[in-house]
């Protein structure tokens, strides 16, 4: 659990957010959204102590552990991949290092024996005997092959380092997990793995992401940073966006009766909660939506930019025709073969591949 009390952050005369009071509870995943520069990453930095708030306090639950997705990909270059992941649980890692030092001593004293006994008890409590296998499981899930688990971090590619940093953040089942853009540089398969992992995560998660699909998949709540204020809403990104747009339309339609507006909002909540998939996080989200009061739905003050292309003439029905298209790399890897398709006016097409250069 994370409690944010009367927190403000100000740089010079610029106030990023002011008088924030929020509570993030276990079993929920909170998607933090806002325009670029609104203060999403700064809010996370304030929570994990990298930046002191101008006013207010931030507190974790008693004895709870906080884990953060590291953005420094060079700090760990001298360590192996396995050690880097296990260092994510600082308490367990410290115990492991102390054990190694004591067991390596030639002049082992009675006092050392008592200390070792104490360390062994803590080591067992933290499931230290499964430390490496747990780390290996995370690494494999995130696409780091077993033959690289004991490679030095400095020998990995940038994209591989991102995955190891993510494994480090997830390691040891932390009570509170902060993730800033966790899907960057991940392929579709790994993003799907992460979605499933977080959807069944039992503790508190705060995540900043520009990936709407990812936020919809994992989040039970949406935290909106907008014009210096931070507001929390039940539901994932799509629910927040669609409900706020509905509330805005109702606000603009002054002629509609209050009862009609309320009925429309209630029907929207029912439809949305009925479509929520079954997982620990989404079940929690469904319960939140079912309890949601329509008065809690407010229109967003956010304004979205629009890019409008005006063609010089009306295009024809067929925009693009592709026939027999093939491509392979210099190494002979086939990226695609004998591709045939047409794109017609009005079509919206997305290209997906497990091979990123395709």
Give the label of every model feature segment.
Residues 149, 297-304:
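Active-site phosphate-binding and catalytic loops of NTP-dependent enzymes
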